[in-house]
Amino acid sequence: TDPDIAVDVDHRMEEFEKLVARIHYVGMKVIIDFVPNHVAREYHSICCPAGVTDLGEEDDVNMHFSPRNNFYYCPGQPFVCPVPTPEGEEPYVENPAKCTGNDRFDNRPGVGDWYETVKLNYGVDYCDAGGRSYHYDPVPSTWTKMTDILLYWASKNIDGFRCDMAEMVPHQFWSYATRIVKGRHPQMVFIGEVYDTEQYRTYVRSGFDYLYDKVGMYDCVRDIICNRRPASSITYYWQNVSDIKEHMLYFLENHDEQRIASDFFCGDGRKAVPGMMVSALMGCNPFMVYAGQEFGELGMDAEGFSGCDGRTTIFDYWCVDTLRRGHYDRRLLTQEEKRLQAIYQQVLCMANSERAFCEGDFFDLMYVNPQSQSFNPRCHYAFLRKKDKEVILVVVNFSEEANHVGVTIPGHAFDYFKMPERDVEAVDLLTDERTTFNLKKDGVVEMDLPPYSGRIFKFSIQMEDKTYELNAHNKEEFPPAHTAEHLLNQVMVRMFGCERSKNAHIERKKSKISYVLDHKPTRQEEKAIADKMNELIAEDLPVTFEFVDRDHIPEGVKIDRLPEDASETIRLVRIGDFDVCPCIGKHVRSTSQIGRFELLGTNWDGLTHSFRIRFKVIP
């Protein structure tokens, strides 16, 4: 663990263990970076457990290669640094030179090499007279030491390893190490950074759960966003790995790649929204979001080591602008940044909650939708997902212009998904818009596509015509006050441990709402209620909707207050990550549209322990 970010350096491991526990407590998992190919040139452990020998401690430095060594050496040759020693500092001395991390096997790495790192020796002699040779029997020293390191961190109750440059380490080691680690920690996840697509299957067989699909899907989608290749090319890249698609990790940003909104990519985070929708929704495999991507982080700072290169520095202590504003004072975010985050939140939530996305089958529609007046495969991409009786049609638009499109659904899709030919009512999960589709084999479904976005239409193929009939609402509520009611319910649940209100009258001029509490709130607690409400309103949390059936209600969501004749399809209203509740009423799009929350007064009934709040919102 990094002593620079410890509160108490001597107890930093205890701090790490407590951090892991806190992360697990809020329902998240911990994946740590494991760098198996190289270490820092000056590496040495300062806290080896008793009986453990450090990397290189027992090496024979007079041998360029030995399967018993942990490093490679240049016997009799000192290390020659490719950059000058800063004024006032002592020159770095290393004799004999260790070989450099990016497979540079002499003592004079260039400025473009990884000269600050040294290559670990896994039993491969890269400079054998007859070419590369392999020495895996007996098991090389580095294999056992690196496996012990994995086991040590696995014992800290983490959930997985992201393995840096995994393909620079022989797959035979990974088979050895993952078998041992997963034997003791069966749920441990291994994520590998592999760039050679021809090696994907080898590393999957070696125990990796997921592989970065950089050279495949990332490069493809990036080029589509930048208008360098057609959207229809997506088909080739998923088909190329169709047998291992569930092992592909999709992404549009990571620490090695340029930021989407940077001048080096496309200059605008919005342009990647259709690519994000495709990457997150077309398969059951994971999609990774890099911190700040959801706000459209520019990555255009000229940091000390890396300079202005469109990436967020990984070498310097630095303040990332959107993260500072987005996570510490949302009032400083621009409206465009808030809108972009809301889209990411919507799509990622449905990717994890809609069974058709996280469990369902996939059908690519591009082969029956060539260039036509109503469809342009250069900027449009369409596919279906299905689970049981739920079908979702996703159509995205990489263009800067709004388009009216017609999407052909072939007879084969009807046969594959066992879909009936009939009218269905569909709802757009992004906008809550409802429409009717006439489903026919080889028929066309028409829709309007906004620029740099898409439509996500969900419908049921049950033969009975229930589809998305929701119960009629018994009153026309004032949306700002109605959303405030949801927000207030969660505030009271968290502050007082009570149930959500069962008695509320929500109106435009003023509203009343009651809670059963174990004590009468003090004046300070009443003030805290109002303060918390206005704090949440100022955070401008997005208000989003999703549709689920009764058998797939998310954990923690109660539907016991719905009427007995409530429909099978339930609409959930989410307010950021703060609240989720079944509801069919009208709401604002984000909490800032509520306006100011004003607590008008309270009443306490000591006999029933009922606490009534009178409030109004001032948009």
Task: Describe each PLM feature range.
Residues 1-13, 117-142, 158-168, 218-225, ...:
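The substrate-binding groove and active-site-proximal loops of carbohydrate-active enzymes
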Residues 38, 47-54, 62, 68-69, ...:
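Active-site-proximal helices and loops of the catalytic beta/alpha 8
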Residues 137-154, 272-276:
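Short, acidic/polar
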Residues 253-254, 259-423:
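Loop/helix patches that line or flank the sugar-binding groove of alpha-linked glycan CAZymes
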